[in-house]
Amino acid sequence: MIRLDDGHQVGVSVGGRGVPLVFLHGLGLSRRAYLRLLSRVAALGFLVVAVDTPGHGDTHDLPCDAGELGDRADLVIRTLDALGIEQAVVAGHSMGGRLTIHLAAAVPDRVLAVILFDAAAGASFDAAVATVTRSPRQILRTITGAMSDMYRDPFWMQVAAASRYLRMLTAVALGKILPPTGFTGAARAIMQSGECTSLLRVIRERQIPTMVLHGASDAIVPFESACEVADDANATLYRVRDACHSWLITDPRRGADSVRRLLDGALGDVLRHAAEALGVDDWRDIAAWDRRLVEPDALVRTLNPDHNLLGMDVRGRVDMELVRRADHPKAARRAAVVREFLRPRDARPA
């Protein structure tokens, strides 16, 4: 855990060394639910930073007058400032995916790439969220979808995830009766965040490389929503076969293999271009990334002095189908953005 300048407590886990990768968890969970996945991702050459969002895990709630999803993204940004991380790949699952979209749109120059795992986003999802409080039929459909998705996952995930989504619906249905804290505050922030299309278009316009991975059998956020996210953000889209909403948690080996596959493809291309812009000779040189993207006296170094990670065990195998390939932005333009951000502040043009 760390404390920000204003005293706000934030839960953080750090592991590995290399390209900073910030991970944001799903609704009602915490960073700890993903540690089996993230320890394996760290072994691929990443400095993994998992952050508990407000009201989850070890992170304290936000004040009542800071209940927007943008306020939650701002807390993550301030956490990165405190840790001394200049730029990072930002990844999120479910609610964390929606929060990742907000963060990338707010500070695009600090985001090397975006990875969205079954993100709670897309025009269809936004429309469902907008009508859920007014339509008993939509509430029933949401509950049915959640239960259907849980049926395909292991029993403990069925119980846990069904509980989370029923609690979310309860929070929405009771409106202002419940205090906007913890789970209720996060659920309400999602429900009140409006359409994310404009934010996805910022990602497109700023040419932030984005990869969308979505379970083919996700009944909570249907694959149609992932297609809409990819179209709006100009993202590369993969359909993960035999995967439901919580596949990252239930099968962390497959989750880690999906990141490895990205490194062999779209994400590897992004990092090669970024390495060239930063003067890194070998994009797989984890020490070089560490020097360029993490401040020498950064707090994150004290949290991970031995570059702790569990290492890769028996590799899983994920079945990913490429559905949409992003229109490649001009590499020179994106590289210029990377170089400009990492220039000393007193050397940047006013």
Enumerate the predicted regions with their spans.
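Flexible "cap/lid" loop of the alpha/beta hydrolase fold
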Residues: 105, 114-145
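Conserved alpha/beta-hydrolase catalytic His-Asp/Glu region
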Residues: 125-130, 144-205
